Amino acid sequence: MTTTCSKPQQPATDDRRWKALGVCLAAGFISLLDTSIVNVALPSMERGLGATEAAQAWVVSGYALTFGLALVPAGRLGDMRGRRQAFLIGLAVFTVASAACGLASSPDRLVVFRLIQGAAAGMVAPQTSGLIQQMFQGSERAKAFGLLGSVIGVSTAVGPLAGGVIIDAVGTDDGWRWVFFVNLPIGVAAFVAGLRLLPRYPATADRRERFDPLGVLLLGCGVLALMLPLVQEQQWTGREKWALLPVGAVLLGLFWVWERRQGRLGRAPLLDLNLFSMRSFTLGALISFSYFAGFTTVFFVLALFLQNAAGYSALAAGVTVLPFAVASAVGAALGGRLVVRHGRKVVVIGLSGVALGLLGIIAVLRLVPIEHFGWAAAVPMIVGGLGSGITVSPNTTLTLTRVPVKRAGAAGGVLQTGQRVGSAAGIAVVGSVYFAHLAHRGPATEALELGLLTSVGFILVALGLAVADLGERAKVPEAPEVSQAPVISEA
């Protein structure tokens, strides 16, 4: 007996969808906030918990690793068994793991709970994009992705500020604990609201359909082999770590062969490889990879420069990047409206704005004394933030708009896995450039300039891909696509 609808209908059109979206965005906010908020809490962990440099590195990189590993399998699980259930389970585990992190009595326990927290975040993320695909169409979908883009931009940029405020308010001994406890009220409220508001869509697959465990193993090991040397680039000093990159490429190649075989045999693959036959999806995923390789690294090197070279406190460093976060939220909301009419042109404009903003920060470095850098960089920060917002949500909309709803979770998982791997690769490359210049006793301003120029290089690669896709289509298709009717929960 299959659980799919025999007569698909259009998604519900009541205001409940927007409330359900608010639940998804709240969960997305705290899961993405945790990618950056802990960075400023590392000294507090060392002082209050006795965390070594290795433990601190795993607190940061372990979250990114398990986050990235969970995305595609979790997306497929949501496609098969229902996104509402997968979302709520992931959110519950994330919230409990956050509490466990804050209560950890040793560095080892903190690392273990942090790994669990990352995997739970990776389970939540693809359900959000999948639910948006199911609940909205056309211009409404673009608006919903615009709001998601605002959350992505704000949560990533505001993390250092939020962490600085918490450490400053609570103190360095226990401040790191509250960096995790801050998730609890939001997580609990989102879970309770989700029970009531998230729609119950019928599962898209037969309950007897298998999950493809070998595909999960090959993909997981391949992504792990790619990400591990990148996220541990500074801590794992031996060159042998780079041997994992070709191993990862081979494993992903085997995954590709296995998934094609599954498709030929009429079995349900973990990942529908036909997605990559869509030019919009493939180019959009590559744009996302390149963009996040450049975007994430900006906050990484700025935090290092402001706190280590310019003498800023964690709070002051967070305030410095606040204009970027605010402008990013505004840009994402604007981009969600513009993409329906102007398509990939919006992404081209956004990427150009990010590149100009970064070049403006470099100009400030050259022209303004270091003690005045914070306020002088506000204008290029705003330009870059607007560009970032205009990039992320429109690119997500264009990348996923032609993906069948029944594959939306896995497709969103692929897109976000690319973002996580891109972020790790960018930080590894830019971090190497920054630290190598400092190791040769170069000025910190020159190290930051070289790091930002490297970030600009990644952004320009994304810009080139966006320009290549300009001719693909001018607009987001407004024609409604077949979707399943939700069964509204009254719980």
Regions found by a protein language model. Give the residues of each.
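12-transmembrane solute porter fold
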Residues: W18-V40, E53, K241, G266-R473, ...
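Small-residue-mediated transmembrane helix hinge/kink sites in multi-pass secondary transporters
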Residues: P43, G75-R76, S129-G130, G164, ...
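Intrinsic disorder in cytosolic terminal tails and internal cytosolic loops
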Residues: M1-R16, D469-A491
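Structural signature of transmembrane alpha-helices in multi-pass secondary transporters
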Residues: S31, V60-Y63, F67, F94, ...
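Transmembrane-helix signature of multi-pass solute transporters
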Residues: V93-L103, I116, A120, I186-A193, ...
